[in-house]
Curated annotation (Swiss-Prot):
InterPro entries linked to this entry: Cis-3-h-L-Pro_dehydratase, DgoD-like, Enolase-like_C_sf, Enolase-like_N, Enolase_C-like, HProlDhtase, Mandelate_racemase_C, Mandelate_racemase_N_dom
Name listed for the protein in its UniProt record: Cis-3-hydroxy-L-proline dehydratase
Top-level class of the enzyme under EC nomenclature: lyase
One Gene Ontology molecular-function label: hydro-lyase activity
Domain of life: Bacteria
Similarity section: Belongs to the mandelate racemase/muconate lactonizing enzyme family.
A single GO BP: cellular response to amino acid stimulus
Amino acid sequence: MKITAINVFQVDLPLREGRYSWSNGNFVEVFDSTVVEIETDEGLKGYAECCPLGSAYLPSYALGVRSGLQELAPHLIGKDPLNIGEINRVMDAALRGHPYAKAPIDIACWDLLGKATGQPLYTLLGGAAQDDVALYRAISQEAPEIMAKKIEGYAAEGYTKFQLKVGGDANDDINRIHATRSVLKKSDLLVADANTGWTRHEAARVVGAVSSLDVYIEQPCLTYEESVSIRRRTALPFVLDEVIDGPNTLVRGIAEDAMDCINLKISKVGGLTKAKLMRDLCIAHGIPMTIEDTWGGDIVTAAIAHLARSTPSEFTFSATDFNSYGTVDIAEGAPKRVNGRMTTSDLPGLGITPIFDVLGEPVARYS
C-alpha cells in the first residue's frame, strides 16, 4: 500500500457553553480544528484530527498544524502508511520537533492499519482492557459559585470526575476548590488544574489552604522544577501534564517520583505511536493516566476512546469526550457519552466516517 494523496480540511468547532477559560486569562470561544485524509493506491482512506487549545497553552497552534503538514506531506507521498514506524522516522527527519503537526498523519496511518486488517484500533493498541471508560468534565474558570453550580449539573448527567480550571488569583482559586469540593459526593474525584498558572509561592499557598480536602493538584507551575518543588511540599495526589511532553520527560518524571498521575494528550506527544509507548511505560511503573488530547471533535474523541479502552481501568484515571463540548458534528460513528462513560465502535480503524458536508472542500491537497 502506498500513500497517493494527503487532503487537509479546516473546521470551526463552537462551544456549547460559549467560552472555555483557563489560567492567566486565556480563553477560546471557537476552536480551529484540522482534519486529515490520507488516500492510498488500494482505495482505503485514513482519517485523523488535530485541534490545539489556542496558541498559549502548549507550543502549538491551529495554523501550525496546517503549516507543518505542508512541510511533511511531500516526504510521505509514495510511502507505505502501514509501516507506521517508518512514517514517523520520515517525519522526524523532515521536520524537527512540532509533534502536534505529525500527530494527525500518525493517527490516520493507524486508522488505515485497522481498516487494512479489519480490526478496531483498540485491538491493535493492545486489545480491549475495559468495555467502556470513565470520563471527566472540565469546568471552565469562573466565579466559585458558578463553577460549583456547573459541577452539580454535570454530576446529574453521570460524571463522577471533574477537572477544575484554576491557575488564577490564589485567593480566588482557594475559594473555587472549597466551593466545588463541597457540592460533590465523597466518591467523586476533583482535580484542581492550574495549567502552569501559579508562581511557586502562589502554588504553595493554595496547596496549604486546601490540604484538608480530597483533591488532586495538576500542573501548578510553568516548569518541571517548580512543579516538583510543590510536589515535595504537599501530601495531596499530584498530576503533571504540560511538562510531560514525550517519553524522555516521562522517564525523568518516573525516576524522580515527580507525580502520581500524568495527563497523556495524544497530539502533544506526536500521535498514537508515542502515546502508546508512554501509556505502556506508565503501566509498567504504576502511573495512572488521564487519556485525552488538547481539544477536538468527533475524530479526536474516537482516537482517545480507542487508546483508553485498550488501557486497564486501574491505569485509566479518566478520559475526555471532547465532542460533547461542541455544537458541530464532523463524523458519524464517534463515541457518545452515556452516564459519564464512553466506548468505541467495533468497526475497523477509528470506526468513524467524516461528514464532508460539514468539512467542505480541502484547504490543501498534496499528491
